C-alpha cells in the first residue's frame, strides 16, 4: 500500500514540475525577443561618394516613434542634426531622419529606440564620405 502512494506522489510531483516549466517558458518567450537593427542606409562602415539626404534604420520589431532618437555626428563628435527621426508610415519597423548638407569626412550615426515591447536599444556606427577622385 505504501508503495502505491509513493508512486502516486512522484507522478504528481512530475506533473507539477512540467507544468511549472511550461508556464515559465510560455510567459518568458516575449521577453527574450528584443528589437535589433537589421539594416541601415547608409550602411555600417560604408564609404560613399555622395552625402546621404537622409538616414534610415530598419529594425526587426515595430518602434515607438515618440522615444526614437537618431543623431548624426561629425568627426569631432559634434551633432549635425536637430530634428527627431520619424517612424516610416508604411513601415513601423523603420525610422528616417533628414540630414543637412554635409561634406567629405567620417561621420557617426548614434541611435536609441524603444520597441513596442518597451525594450530600449542604443548603439552607433560610422560611415565615410570621400570625393570621387580619392
Where are the language model's segments positioned?
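Bacterial N-terminal signal peptides that target proteins for export
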Residues: 2-17
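N-terminal signal peptide c-region/cleavage motif recognized by signal peptidases
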Residues: 27-28
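N-terminal edge beta-strand
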Residues: 32-51
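Extended, polar beta-sheet/loop recognition surfaces of beta-rich domains
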Residues: 50, 54-61, 119-134
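Short, surface-exposed alpha-helix to beta-strand junction/turn motifs within ectodomains of secreted
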Residues: 55-56, 61-83
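Surface-exposed, short loops/turns at beta-strand junctions within beta-sandwich domains
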Residues: 100-105
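A short tyrosine-centered beta-strand micro-motif
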Residues: 107-109
Amino acid at each position: 500500500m505504501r508503495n502505491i502512494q509513493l508512486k502516486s506522489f512522484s507522478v504528481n510531483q512530475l506533473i507539477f514540475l512540467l507544468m511549472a516549466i511550461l508556464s515559465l517558458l510560455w510567459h518568458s518567450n516575449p521577453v527574450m525577443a528584443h528589437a535589433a537593427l537589421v539594416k541601415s542606409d547608409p550602411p555600417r562602415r560604408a564609404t560613399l561618394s555622395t552625402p546621404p539626404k537622409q538616414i534610415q534604420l530598419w529594425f526587426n520589431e515595430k518602434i515607438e516613434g515618440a522615444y526614437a532618437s537618431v543623431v548624426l555626428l561629425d568627426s569631432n563628435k559634434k551633432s549635425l542634426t536637430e530634428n527627431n527621426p520619424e517612424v516610416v508610415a508604411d513601415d513601423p519597423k523603420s525610422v528616417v531622419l533628414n540630414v543637412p548638407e554635409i561634406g567629405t569626412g567620417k561621420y557617426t550615426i548614434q541611435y536609441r529606440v524603444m520597441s513596442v515591447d518597451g525594450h530600449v536599444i542604443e548603439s552607433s556606427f560610422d560611415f565615410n564620405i570621400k570625393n570621387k577622385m580619392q
